[in-house]
Amino acid sequence: MRIRSLYSIMIVFILLAFALPAGAFNCNVNVTGLSFGGYDVFSAIPKDSAATITVTCNAPPQNPNAPIPVSISLSPGSSGSFAQRQLQRLGGPELLAYNLFTTPSFSTVWGDGSGGSQSQTNLVTRTTPWNATIFGRIPAGQNVPAGSYSDVITVTIEW
């Protein structure tokens, strides 16, 4: 039995942060990339991975412990659809279906609230950062050629 694998499947996250007026809440964001590693086209098991978005915030001096509502939304990527995002093979037209989810049960698509997706909102305080996990899944049974596949997702953080 010959096994073909895909290596270096990467999703690149682009972070957009919004500047706020002086004296407003100050937040910092760190995003780790999501890499699926090798994908076995003969496996009956989906390929899963995860990434983390960490948001830390400081409130203004007059109320340093104030909770700050933070919202995180993700773009649909190059496919333009939350129903099924797609990784494209570098140098070729081949596509590999995948999606990003809010929970490890892979039941809720993480997006911007449109097209059946949901954004995520949480309260962040000076002492309590938000470590939001993005759960990625490539469904099994996709017959694609070996190569590097990627997509670009824009992560939008609002506070």
Please identify what each model-predicted range represents:
Residues 1-7:
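Positively charged n-region of N-terminal signal peptides that target proteins for export
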